Amino acid sequence: QPINEPLVPIFSGNSMINPNRWQPLSLNVFIDQSGNILEESTPEFLGAEWGNVNPFGLNENDMTTFTRDGNTYNVYHDPGMPPELDGNQETDEDYINSFAMVSIWGSHLSKDDGIIWDISPNSIGNVSEESYPENLSDYDSFYDYYNGGDSGMGYSSNPITNQSYETQEVLRGDYTRVLAEFWADGPDSETPPGHWFVLLNDISDNPLLEKKFQGSGDVLSNLEWDIKSYFIMGGVMHDAAITAWGIKGWYDYVRPISAIRYMADLGQSTDETLSNYNSKGLPLIDGYIEIVNEGDQLAGESNENIGKIKVYTWRGHDYIQNPFEDQAGVGWILAEEWWPYQRPTFVTPNFAGYVSGHSTYSRAAAESLTLFTGSPYFPGGMGEYIARENEFLVFEEGPSQDIKLQWASYRDASDQCSLSRIWGGIHPYIDDMPGRFIGSIVGVESFNYGAAYFESTLSTIDLELPKLKLASNPIYSDQLIEIINTNGNEIFKLYNISGQQIKINTSYNQHRTSIIHQRLNSGIYLLKSQHITWKILVR
């Protein structure tokens, strides 16, 4: 049962009891994931028990079991507690800054600011996994806090053809809105995992694709390719769902609409000399988060709003009468009335935010496609989807021009999906990055498990091969890498994310092999045996 009473978004403010826990929403009309219309609904938490579902290829050694209120929660790849608004200065700052950025990125959702971006692979994508921040203190060096986007610098040339990519300069406000809706996967949609089956179908239909399993061997028939790719993708998405929803169910973490409105009710956390100071309030940021003063258009007829917090962001559904013709635009609104860029009949998914399911699903799918096709890149080095002018957007009118979403690699598409949830207003970055890390691990592990079914020796003694498992993952930099169910004859090689081999020694004892290494730097590594590849996260 939820700790907090439901929030009714059409009313201002939020007086929830616990700002660290999920809050249901009460809507006049709710359209669920399947497109069903429910009148005056308060949707329950969807799938809180999913960590207890039988997995496809998840390793029980990566599972932690928790209990609360007599219920059992199985959590795979436990990322630990997200920052809480609890009076601790460090965690309060992490919480406040993360959710404040969601409102700030809402200011990018209008074409009227005239800001132009090149959204081709020339300028976006190609994010190094080594640049992924592992500590919250490093997040602001990865995300562009005020302008939007991440640290990706794009490609100097197409990695497949070696030709330059054609630039695509568009209005940022068109791009961000298209991105938010393209990856929304909300009501009446194929859902996030289904979205990656759509991408898989398009990849499989691309005439530039050579249908070789893992990029080598004989060309597969269309039927064999489809069966194997669907089997693998289905297993990977199943495990990603179990992992993400096990975490969601246990940590039961708050969503932006609840957190932003709650902090707005408390006041501001920047200037202790002002009467509206509260250490748990929103930060004051010129041009983005300010105080309503006398003479302000938001002051109210009786100046009842003086001293309240206002935000410069997407203005919400009060400014849209006809979504086929109207745009809410960006402007100053009371923070207590903040809305995410979503449908008013959906507003925010009815389950906890941490970790981002989109980030987990997408990264797992990208890793699986990379291994299955034998290449990290879309066929021909380009995946492309077109959002037509004044046709594509559903939440409001637009875009004002054709927008081509373009990606060189599967990981580029995954990274873009993760960013879209911040612009869409349903995830802060503290939900995003752990989902990416976990998805990258699940995608590889579950692929390896499924790929073992394609071995010609599956029904012989070699069936033991898929049982090789990492004793723990992630590990710390000075911790040995240990593999269980070994026989002492395996050959292991360790590589960093750049492909450089790391010198190691091995020690075998009673069906357990220890990989001995010099202290590893934080980052992602690949451990390979004759038959299996693991992606290892070093903290």
PLM regions and their residue ranges:
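C-terminal outer-membrane/trafficking sorting elements
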Residues: 461-539
